[in-house]
Amino acid sequence: MNVIPCSINTLKGLYDISGVEVGQHLYWQIGGLQVHAQVLITSWVVIAILLGSVTLAVRNPQTIPADGQNFFEYLLEFIRDLSKTQIGEEYGPWVPFIGTMFLFIFVSNWSGALLPWKIIQLPHGELAAPTNDINTTVALALLTSVAYFYAGLSKKGLSYFGKYIQPTPILLPINILEDFTKPLSLSFRLFGNILADELVVVVLVSLVPLVVPIPVMFLGLFTSGIQALIFATLAAAYIGESMEGHH
């Protein structure tokens, strides 16, 4: 007789658990829009770091580069090589886009481990890396989608949509679905890896002394850089694919 009440209580408990959010959020009301303030604040910090670093490095350019200028020239060469490898000979106009994606994601990922976000007190929630929030990663993935649609349409015009019936019209639904899964895979891969890395570090710090999680933090820095590289590489590959001829 007690089976039904127990089952109801169990289901109620599972329902309550399903409503629990991962962390709390601080929102701003700007006009009629509700803005996620934590992501906005940390994104501004990351952008300020990037702009400040570049300004300091190139404010007095030298014929023979040194220090910061040398580093950023090497970084530019790396991004150009990456873009050329994935896009092809028409890579030039896309270097700024790929470079912006790579640098923003890279600095955002590292900021989660290197910047003391926790010391900044908020009315609700706490600050974390911008890429620790699904809103940021989805926005970056959607920008990538817009970029490769623009690349394909600007290169081929309306004939770009002919790829959806290649090599046979039977594959039309699958080819359309593929364009929707690209931004989903980009966003969830980046979000999942960064969130998991920060959660592992937080759990280890709460369970064991500070020295023990340090190797995990270094591993997190390495994987954060790899995730930025993967995102930029796939973005360039999608753009290059949209500009290729049908096979």
UniProtKB/Swiss-Prot annotation:
Presence of the UniProt keyword Transmembrane helix in the record: yes
InterPro entries: ATP_syn_F0_a_bact/chloroplast, ATP_synth_F0_asu, ATP_synth_F0_asu_AS, F0_ATP_A_sf
A Pfam family that the UniProt record links to this protein: ATP-synt_A
Gene Ontology cellular-component terms listed: chloroplast thylakoid membrane; plasma membrane; proton-transporting ATP synthase complex
CDD domains, alphabetized: ATP-synt_Fo_a_6
Protein keywords: ATP synthesis, CF(0), Chloroplast, Hydrogen ion transport, Ion transport, Membrane, Plastid, Thylakoid, Transmembrane, Transmembrane helix, Transport
Localization: Plastid, Chloroplast thylakoid membrane
GO MF annotation terms: proton-transporting ATP synthase activity, rotational mechanism
Transmembrane segments annotated in the record for this chain: 38-58, 95-115, 134-154, 199-219, 220-240
Membrane topology summary: Multi-pass membrane protein
Family listed: Belongs to the ATPase A chain family.
Subunit field text: F-type ATPases have 2 components, CF(1) - the catalytic core - and CF(0) - the membrane proton channel. CF(1) has five subunits: alpha(3), beta(3), gamma(1), delta(1), epsilon(1). CF(0) has four main subunits: a, b, b' and c.
Biological role stated in the UniProt entry: Key component of the proton channel; it plays a direct role in the translocation of protons across the membrane.
Family matches, as PANTHER family: ATP SYNTHASE SUBUNIT A, CHLOROPLASTIC
Protein known as: ATP synthase subunit a, chloroplastic
Species the sequence originates in: Lemna minor
